Curated annotation (Swiss-Prot):
Record's compositionally biased regions (Low complexity): 34-45
The entry's DNA-binding region: 58-238
GO CC terms: cytoplasm; nucleoplasm; nucleus; protein-containing complex; protein-DNA complex; transcription regulator complex
GO molecular function: DNA binding; DNA-binding transcription activator activity, RNA polymerase II-specific; DNA-binding transcription factor activity; DNA-binding transcription factor activity, RNA polymerase II-specific; RNA polymerase II cis-regulatory region sequence-specific DNA binding; RNA polymerase II transcription regulatory region sequence-specific DNA binding; RNA polymerase II-specific DNA-binding transcription factor binding; sequence-specific DNA binding
Gene3D superfamilies with a match to the protein in the record: Transcription factor, T-box (2.60.40.820)
Modified residue annotations for N6-acetyllysine: 339
Keyword Transport: no
Any GO BP annotation: positive regulation of secondary heart field cardioblast proliferation
Subunit structure: Monomer. Homodimer (via the T-box); binds DNA as homodimer. Interacts (via the T-box) with NKX2-5 (via the homeobox); this complex binds DNA. Interacts with GATA4. Interacts with KAT2A and KAT2B.
Pfam families referenced in this protein's UniProt entry, alphabetically: T-box
The protein's name in its UniProt record: T-box transcription factor TBX5
Length: 518
């Protein structure tokens, strides 16, 4: 037996009076350390033939003593909660071939009810009536003595509950009451059971395992001990001051939270060819910065922002800009990125600026395209009075920019000079044939003068809204000073037309009238 004790590492334990092994003998239980006044405690532990010499050693006794000095508390829940420290023992002195049943029960340590006040436990009244005791049988029972002595006997699956109607076999306890666990070693009978008169058994009690049942930890020292020693006590770490300090330090260093103002400043300071006069409202960038701030994502904010785009967004039907007012002496024609490509560059070089971002469907006819272009041009119609003269191309300056009317609170900066032409109702547009080839051909001979029954279509390229007076007496304005192929052609119309297409007008019996300039 000494070899077994030395192999377990507790050879000196039986020499100490406090850690004396609980052997099966006929001594009163009060000598074993259990309270002698406890009504539920047996007054004696009996031993019978074949049960002599059995010794039990408590595993992790030092840890149990740490909790016992402070006042051990065990959580009880309705669903059941395991004990920590776990009840584990080392058993020696069993007959290797005899079958034994190991079981536990938890009995009241006294008849008092406790409360925790002023950082200590004190008696507050008489204990509630004890529930009928339940026994927890080890799952390996029955087993031979060789099986029990081969390794530690663990009761870690035992659960404590305060549900008096518990159907799962958990040990039922009352909160704020003190309890004492007990270990019973029973020799199995011929039916591998126990309970008969001749059943041999012995009981072992370790006073340092006594505890008070609670629904939540009362002593913060017990909480700290559970956190330090129980790797599964994560549920209590969130409310611990040390854990909160650690989490705050981790958030401040490893996962910094980027302020909203910093991200917005970086969004507005992105490089753009229009940064000298306009500031684009990038909605996607603002949304990204909000998610970044709220979620606390680390890393530079520029990684989550879209790269600076040197061109306007061609896929949007309407371009949103905020134009700032500037003085005349600070403004020149070369500083306007919208005016310069119209007057100084060819359509091929600045194609990406003024081409429509969405391709026209090839199956659509020319009349459908011109109608959609006419409606798009009407969408950008201004609300200025009809009597206001339209400025010519030479008169456009910085003073005219802020004075132009806005659509949807966004100033349209690409304003083109228009020549007044007779206006007809929209019903005439829907009955006409394709007029874009005819207008393109006429542009080479000058601007034709149309009669009262004639009308003229004009297409609107993306980001080139045409200013139009929508009064009943005003005429439809068409460009005069620009190169005709750049403004009048759509994507689906060829730029070289044969002469017989010049007069392809399907009006209501109308013949075009040519001016002297033609």
């Amino acid at each position: 037996m000494a070899d077994t004790d030395e192999g377990f590492g507790l050879a000196r334990t039986p020499l100490e009076p406090d850690s004396k092994d609980r052997s099966c003998d006929s001594k009163p239980e009060s000598a074993l350390g259990a309270p002698s006044k406890s009504p539920s405690s047996p007054q004696a532990a009996f031993t019978q033939q074949g049960m002599e010499g059995i010794k039990v050693f408590l595993h992790e006794r030092e840890l149990w003593l740490k909790f016992h000095e402070v006042g051990t508390e065990m959580i009880i829940t309705k669903a059941g909660r395991r004990m920590f420290p776990s009840y584990k023992v080392k058993v020696t002195g069993l007959n290797p071939k005899t079958k034994y049943i190991l079981l536990m029960d938890i009995v009241p340590a006294d008849d008092h009810r406790y409360k925790f006040a002023d950082n200590k436990w004190s008696v507050t009244g008489k204990a509630e009536p004890a529930m009928p005791g339940r026994l927890y049988v080890h799952p390996d029972s029955p087993a031979t003595g060789a099986h029990w002595m081969r390794q530690l006997v663990s009761f870690q699956k035992l659960k404590l509950t305060n549900n008096h109607l518990d159907p799962f076999g958990h040990i039922i306890l009352n909160s704020m009451h003190k309890y004492q666990p007990r270990l019973h070693i029973v020799k199995a009978d011929e039916n591998n059971g126990f309970g008969s008169k001749n059943t041999a058994f012995c009981t072992h009690v370790f006073p340092e395992t006594a505890f008070i049942a609670v629904t939540s930890y009362q002593n913060h020292k017990i909480t700290q001990l559970k956190i330090e020693n129980n790797p599964f006590a994560k549920g209590f770490r969130g409310s611990d001051d040390l854990e909160l300090h650690r989490m705050s330090r981790m958030q401040s260093k490893e996962y910094p939270v980027v302020p909203r103002s910093t991200v917005r400043h970086k969004v507005t300071s992105n490089h753009s060819p229009f940064s000298s006069e306009t500031r684009a409202l990038s909605t996607s960038s603002n949304l990204g910065s909000q998610y970044q701030c709220e979620n606390g994502v680390s890393g530079p904010s520029q990684d989550l922002l879209p790269p600076p785009n040197p061109y306007p967004l061609a896929q949007e039907h309407s371009q949103i800009y905020h134009c700032t007012k500037r003085k005349d002496e600070e403004c020149s024609s070369t500083e306007h990125p919208y005016k310069k490509p119209y007057m100084e560059t060819s359509p091929s070089e600045e194609d990406t600026f003024y081409r429509s971002g969405y391709p026209q469907q090839q199956g659509l006819s020319t009349s459908y395209r011109t109608e959609s272009a006419q409606r798009q041009a009407c969408m950008y119609a201004s609300s200025a009075p009809p009597s206001e003269p339209v400025p010519s191309l030479e008169d456009i300056s910085c003073n005219t920019w802020p004075s132009m009317p806005s659509y949807s609170s966004c100033t349209v900066t690409t304003v083109q000079p228009m020549d007044r032409l007779p206006y007809q109702h929209f019903s005439a547009h829907f009955t006409s044939g394709p007029l874009v080839p005819r207008l393109a051909g006429m542009a080479n001979h000058g601007s034709p003068q149309l009669g009262e029954g004639m009308f003229q279509h004009q297409t609107s390229v993306a980001h080139q809204p045409v200013v139009r007076q929508c009064g009943p007496q005003t005429g439809l304005q068409s460009p005069g000073g620009l190169q005709p192929p750049e403004f009048l052609y759509t994507h689906g119309v060829p730029r070289t037309l044969s002469p017989h297409q010049y007069h392809s007008v399907h009006g209501v019996g109308m013949v075009p009238e040519w001016s002297e300039n033609s």
